[in-house]
A protein has these predicted regions:
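Intrinsically disordered, low-complexity segments enriched in glycine/proline and serine/threonine
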Residues: 5-6, 20, 47
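C-terminal segment of classical bacterial N-terminal signal peptides
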Residues: 15-24
């Protein structure tokens, strides 16, 4: 009888000891899920851009964003992901996580309306990234650089990159420049510091 009571006692102690571990595991899974964003529609992409530019992704180096379909942005006014710099070249908000394009294409992206509004601004699908990884993304579209401002960085994938990696991405942009000075206006990235392209 004593052995039976002792056995039950130890079984209860073991069960109680496992409860915090189960709760911790659930919290960990919840945290991992909450930092992942899946994009399947144009509206979801536009919302993601707005969230980054509003500061919702500030400091989220563990953020994972996955593009799950090709998206056509015909008729949409595009604001680069990663806020425009002010005239002192300060960037209020930017993306620092992982963006997986998964081989998908963003098409008919028109950067023309955004270009030239602020001097020293960085333009692209992403405006500015830091400690980020962008992969498997194709951007198709156009830009007509007619603004009066100069010295802007333009890249189809990202305008300016710092301490980041851009991997397996494709730029397919038609470009018209009306007497403005731009860095990197032909390729993936306008300006890069401590960044890797693969």
């Amino acid at each position: 009888m004593k052995k039976c009571v002792v056995g039950i006692f130890f079984a209860l102690v073991l069960c109680l000891a496992m409860l915090p571990m189960a709760a911790f595991a659930e919290d960990t899974v919840g945290a991992a899920q909450s930092s992942r964003t899946v994009i399947t529609t144009v509206d979801e992409l536009m919302q993601f851009a707005a969230d980054v530019n509003a500061g919702a992704y500030d400091g989220k180096t563990d953020a994972v964003v996955s593009l799950e379909s090709d998206l056509d942005l015909s008729g949409k006014t595009w604001t680069s992901i990663g806020c425009a710099a002010d005239n002192d070249a300060n960037v209020p908000h930017f993306f620092s996580g992982k963006f997986y394009g998964n081989g998908h294409t963003i098409s008919n992206l028109d950067f023309s309306d955004a270009y030239g509004m602020i001097e020293y601004e960085s333009y692209g699908f992403f405006g500015y990234i830091e400690n980020a990884e962008i992969s498997g993304l194709t951007v198709q579209g156009s830009v007509n650089a007619t603004g009066s401002r100069k010295y802007s960085d333009f890249g189809s994938i990202v305008g300016a990159s710092n301490k980041s990696t851009i991997r397996d991405c494709v730029s397919d942009i038609s470009f018209t420049n009306s007497d403005n000075y731009l860095d990197g206006s032909i390729g993936l990235c306008g300006f890069a510091m401590d960044s890797t392209f693969e």
